[in-house]
Structures are given as structure tokens and as C-alpha cells.
Amino acid sequence: MNPSTAQAHAVVDELIRGGVRDVVLCPGSRNAPLAFALHDADKAGRLRLHVRIDERTAGFLAVGLAAASGSPVPVAMTSGTAVANLGPAVVEANYARVPLIVLSANRPYELLGTGANQTMEQLGYFGTQVRAAISIGLAEEGSEKIEAQNPHWRSATCRVLAAAKGSRTANAGPVQFDIPLREPLVPDRDGGPIPAGRPGGAPWTYTPDVTFDEPVEIDLTADTVVIAGHGAATHPNLSMLPTVAEPTAPQPDNPVHPLALTLLHPQQVIMLGRPTLHRQVSSLLADSRIPVYALTTGPRWPDVSGNSQATGTRAVTSGSPDPAWLQRCAHAHHKALDAVRGQLSTHPLTTGLHVAAHVCGSLRDGDQLVLGASNPVRDAALVPWGAKDVRVRSNRGVAGIDGTVSTAIGAALAHRGGRTVALIGDLTFVHDSSGLLIGPTEPRPENLTIVVSNDNGGGIFELLEQGDPRFHDVSSRIFGTPHDVDIAALCRAYHVDSQSISVEELGPALDEPARGIRVLEVKADRSTLRELHAAIRAAL
């Protein structure tokens, strides 16, 4: 067995021993040893291989797989710009704490700076965005040297996995594993044994997950509201408290609508995870008169306003909430929900908020919901839901719209045996439409419905400062960015079934049995979004 083939097989074997079950592969010459090793493992049923031609979408496919499965997912690619195309997915994985592994093949390091083809300084390319950038030396010729190097290859692979999973830090995230490979890049005719790992399929270096436990004492006799953001953990001893939960947070037992915060005057706040969606929440967290306790699952905690009084991982509570406070919060919550329902029913045009209401109202227990990071995740936070036991995903690490179709496909591939619904805007869909390109030999989601709320542009800007009517003539072009893309034709190009339906038809369409991937397009209006949201606030 030639050195590069032996090295690649040892690395792939050790990844599998460390818990990797899905790998995304992009074609190339320099990463051929890894490609052959991954194909062999896929054929043997040891992992599931997903081949993609575009490294950017491949990265977000891996983000979806890793976020939904909780396991590290490598993306293997050749050298050069192939590596650079992982940049957006790496940044998202960093801030969302997703265990993504960039498995980058490289030229031998002596070729750096020589003008060699498809060669760049790619080790360390991602800088501070990765938990670690790890490399291993070139494999050397000869069976004795291969046996001598095998422990180093396997040990480095275990180090990569530990960094990606946050085993020693409680801070999962992306890692670059850069492997220089020398020719020959294809297996020998006579083959040979793979360098052996530990007996019984054990990893070369076992790294137990760290226990990160920082208790914080909190007295609940003060009027308390919980703000649960992206990445929030479940805290059973806080379940009785009024909770404003973003869609990606665990759904609360005692919910408070985000718009209801303007009707309430809490005396303290317990912040779980990283809230990013609502201006009412941001204003509350910035109020220096109100103590804020930040509870997170890792070493970092959000504190945009610098107002957190204490941080930790769990609350040690004393006292009980005032029943009158709980009643006021419940009343405000229902008043806000009634305001949303009432204005949706009387508004003359279909908006993205209407589409979100029909999608969320059609959800069933056991579903997985993927939300676009722009208006859809915000809309889903405002409307009533039809089920509580729903797994919700959204790329809220850095909240970009790029890669959302690929993320949804990855999440659906990891959500076996259940239904996945994705709600995204038209710009988000068009931006990552190449994520629909799945080869005929590749695994496909069993049941993924992508609902495209199509208002022909960027509806979120209608609700921001740029959407002020005095800027209409300018903003409609440079922020609204109408595109006139034929969604149905785009789907046909990728052999994906699609329908264009009304919002009233959306619920029944979602209830229909579905296989594979389908797209439901609902035409919406964004010109009256500002008016609709103002009417909802006025109804409070």
C-alpha cells in the first residue's frame, strides 16, 4: 500500500472510530486518497458518503448534518480555492458551535511559494474562526515507516475530533485538518493491509467530554422573565417562569410572546443561550436597572450591552414567583397572540407573516423545522404553533442567508424517519439554489418540504430603517433587490418537484404525504409589511 493511500485509510478509520457517521466529499485530484478511503468505508456501511461538486454548498450541507445529528461531520476537498469556499460555513459553525471538520488535502509543503499549480498557504487559512488547525506530515515510503507513522496519524485525528466536539472545552466548533499528500494518489494494484487501530474498534486516544458546571444563585421572588435564545439548554427548575423563547430554543411551558414584553415590567432577567431576534428583548437586556443572569452551556456568554450581573451554566434557585406576576404575563401573552391573529385575519394581502402562520400552524409533534435566518425565523416567533415537540434549526450563528437550502437538506438527511419542513424566503432560496443539486447516486432526504415565501426580494428591509417610506424610490432597488426568478423553472432544472399555491392551500398541501424533496412556492407581498407590523403593535 502506497504511503498516501495508507495515511488516508488510517485517518478515515480513526474518524469512524471517533463517532463520524456522515462525510461530505467534493471531487478533486489531490484529495483522491481520501476519496478512495471514504468510498470504501461507505461501501462497507461504516459511514454515509455525500458527494457534492460545490464546496460552498457542501460546507453548509455538513453544517445541517452536524447540527441535526450532534456528531462531527467532515468535508473533504482538494487544495486551493476549494478550501477557501468553506469560509462561510466555517464562520457559521464557529458562532453556532457546530462540529464541522474541514478535511483539506494539500500539496507537499515544499511546493508552497514555488508557483506550483493549485497551491496556496491553506493551513491556518481560517484563522480565529476554527477551534484548531492541525496538520500531519507527509507519509513516507516503506511498510516500517508507515507503521511508525500510524500512531501519529491516528493521534492527530483524535485531536481533531476532540477539538471539534469540544471534549476538553465544552465549546464545539469547526476544525481544519490539513493533510499534505504526495503522489501516487491512487491505490496500488496489489493493495495491502491498512495500518491497524486499537483493538475492538476503540479510538486511538479516548477523550471524555468535559463536565462544565458553574451554578448561579438566583432568587425567584422578584418578578422574573426568562429570555431563551439560540443554543439555550433546558432548565427544568425554571420551567414555571414566564419565558420568551426564540424558535430555535426549547419550547417553554410558560410562554410569553416577544411583543408582550412592552406590556410587562420585570425586575430581573434570566438569559439562556444567545438571543438575537427581537428589539424588545435587546432593549430589556440593555436596561441597566434590571439585573441579568446569563446561563450558557459553554465558556462564552453573550452580553451585548455589558449588563450581565452573573454568568454560569445552571441556576440554583430560591423563593417562588408571585402568582400575580405569572397571571399578568399570561394575560399579556394571550393579548399579543390575539393581536397577531386579528391583524392577520383582516390584512388584505398575503405577507410572509401569513405564510409563517400557516406553516407553524400545520406542524406536528416529531417534525423538524428549518427556518431562514432573515424574516422567517422572526415571523415564526410571532405566530401560533400547532405543535410543541418540534426540532427547530436556523443558521443563527452569524445569521446569514447563504447556504440555507443546503443546511435544510443536511438537517433532513439527519432527521431519519420524520418530516422536515423548511420555511425560507425567495432570496434565500435563489442564493443557495445550487444546494438542490444532488447526484443520482447520492443519499436524498426522505421527506423534505421547502416552503418558499416569495415576495420577490428582501422583505426584511421593509421593517428596518431602510424601509422608511421616504427612501422608497431608492430602497426598492438596492435593498429590495427584485429578481423575477422563475422558481418552478429553477426546480425543474434540478429535477425537484414544485407547486405554486395560495397561502390557504398551504396547510392541506403540507398534510399530504411527501417523499424526497419538494418545493411549495407561495406568492407574498412585502409592500405592506411595515403597515401590518405597525397595526399589530397598535393592537396591543
Swiss-Prot record:
What is the annotated quaternary arrangement, including any partners? Homodimer.
**What keywords would UniProt list here?**
Magnesium, Manganese, Menaquinone biosynthesis, Metal-binding, Thiamine pyrophosphate, Transferase
**What protein name applies here?**
2-succinyl-5-enolpyruvyl-6-hydroxy-3-cyclohexene-1-carboxylate synthase
PANTHER family, per this entry?
2-SUCCINYL-5-ENOLPYRUVYL-6-HYDROXY-3-CYCLOHEXENE-1-CARBOXYLATE SYNTHASE, PROTEIN PHYLLO, CHLOROPLASTIC
Species the sequence originates in: Mycobacteroides abscessus (strain ATCC 19977 / DSM 44196 / CCUG 20993 / CIP 104536 / JCM 13569 / NCTC 13031 / TMC 1543 / L948) (Mycobacterium abscessus)
Q: What is the lineage of its organism?
A: Bacteria, Bacillati, Actinomycetota, Actinomycetes, Mycobacteriales
Give one GO molecular function term. Answer: 2-succinyl-5-enolpyruvyl-6-hydroxy-3-cyclohexene-1-carboxylic-acid synthase activity
The encoding gene is menD
Q: Which cofactor does it need?
A: Mg(2+); Mn(2+); thiamine diphosphate
Q: Name one Pfam family in it.
A: TPP_enzyme_N
Known EC number(s)? 2.2.1.9
CC cofactor note? Binds 1 thiamine pyrophosphate per subunit.
- Quote the pathway field: Quinol/quinone metabolism; 1,4-dihydroxy-2-naphthoate biosynthesis; 1,4-dihydroxy-2-naphthoate from chorismate: step 2/7; Quinol/quinone metabolism; menaquinone biosynthesis
Q: Which reaction does it catalyse?
A: isochorismate + 2-oxoglutarate + H(+) = 5-enolpyruvoyl-6-hydroxy-2-succinyl-cyclohex-3-ene-1-carboxylate + CO2
